[in-house]
C-alpha cells in the first residue's frame, strides 16, 4: 500500500479539490484507494458534515461513511487549535496516528491523508501537523495555488520538509485562477530554487483525466 499525506502551502489552496480528483482517477482505473480527512473544520451548508468531508464522500459516491474517513470535526472554519481549545477537544497526535494506522491492514492500493491547511498548522499550543507527519513517517504531496506569494510559501514548506527529513513525493501547481499572470514563470522559479520538478500543473475546471499521469507517478 502506498501512503501520501496531502498538505497545502496554506489554507484554501485546493487540497480537497486535488484529493477528490485523485479519488476519481483511482476509481476510474479500479485502483483501491481511501482518502482520510482526520481533522476537518467548516460545516457544509448542505449537511451536518464538514464541507471537505462531504466532498470526499461524494467523490466515493458514499461507499464510505464519515466516521471511516474523519476523526475530529469542527463546525466553524477556524484554525483547529483555536476551536479545539474553545470546545475543549483534545487533538491528540497519538489518537490521530492510531486512527490512520488502523487503515493499514485494509485491502488498499493507496491511502491518502488530507491534512488541515499547511505543514505547521497547530493542533494545540505545543503540537502541529508536522508532528503528526513525523510520527507517521510517510511522504508528503504538496499542493500550491499559483498566485502572488506562492513562491515564498512553497519554498518555505519544502525547506521545512527537508529540514525534518520528510520525503516530498511531489508538488502540484493548482492553476485555478485564470487572472493570474506569469504562471509558468512562477512554477519554473519554484522548480529551480527548490530542486523539485512540478509533478502536475492543474488548470481551472480540470477533470480526472488530467490526473492520470500524476496517479501513475504516485502508484
From Swiss-Prot:
Supply one GO molecular-function term.
dethiobiotin synthase activity
Per UniProt, subunit arrangement is:
Homodimer.
Protein name (Swiss-Prot/TrEMBL) = ATP-dependent dethiobiotin synthetase BioD
Kindly list the positions annotated as binding ATP. 12-17, 52, 114-117, 174-175
Organism field:
Francisella tularensis subsp. holarctica (strain LVS)
Cite the active-site annotation: 37
Q: Any stretches that span the bilayer, and where are they?
A: none
Query: What NCBIfam families is this protein classified in?
Result: bioD
